[in-house]
Swiss-Prot record:
Family: Belongs to the GnRH family.
Species of origin: Verasper moseri (Barfin flounder)
Biased composition (Basic residues): 80-90
Cellular localisation: Secreted
Entry protein name: Progonadoliberin-3
Entry comment describing in which tissues the protein is expressed: Brain; ventromedial olfactory bulbs and terminal nerve ganglion.
The organism's place on the tree of life at top rank: Eukaryota
Function per UniProt: Stimulates the secretion of gonadotropins.
Pfam families named in the record: GnRH
MF annotations from Gene Ontology: gonadotropin hormone-releasing hormone activity; gonadotropin-releasing hormone receptor binding
One Gene Ontology term, aspect cellular component: extracellular space
Pyrrolidone carboxylic acid: modified positions: Q24
Region annotation Disordered: where it falls in the sequence: 57-90
Name of the gene this protein is made from: gnrh3
Primary residence: secreted
Taxonomic lineage: Eukaryota, Metazoa, Chordata, Craniata, Vertebrata
Length: 90
């Protein structure tokens, strides 16, 4: 009985490992949320031999045009974040 339950557990673990190993290739090149970047999509379409670039839906093209603006770091010379000395200098 113990040998058969051990065999069942080993088969289940093997099935899980095989499933994870075979499904890893699907996640390559995808962004969080299951979205692909536009450049990769165009490259994929060209590789498929369609001969042209497929126009993107209006929602997707609006997202690609909107870029985050860089922020400016302002150094006001404050020493607020400097560590306090534990021992006075003698």
């Amino acid at each position: 009985m113990e040998a058969s339950s051990r065999l069942v557990v080993q088969v289940l673990v093997l099935m899980l490992v095989v499933q994870v190993a075979l499904s890893q290739h699907w996640s390559y090149g995808w962004l969080p949320g299951g979205k692909r970047s536009v450049g990769e999509l165009e490259a994929t379409i060209r590789m498929m031999g369609t001969g042209g670039v497929v126009s993107l839906p209006e929602e997707a093209s609006a997202q690609t045009q909107e870029r985050p603006r860089p922020y400016n770091v302002i150094d006001d010379g404050s020493r607020h974040f400097h560590r306090k000395k534990r021992f006075p200098d003698n």
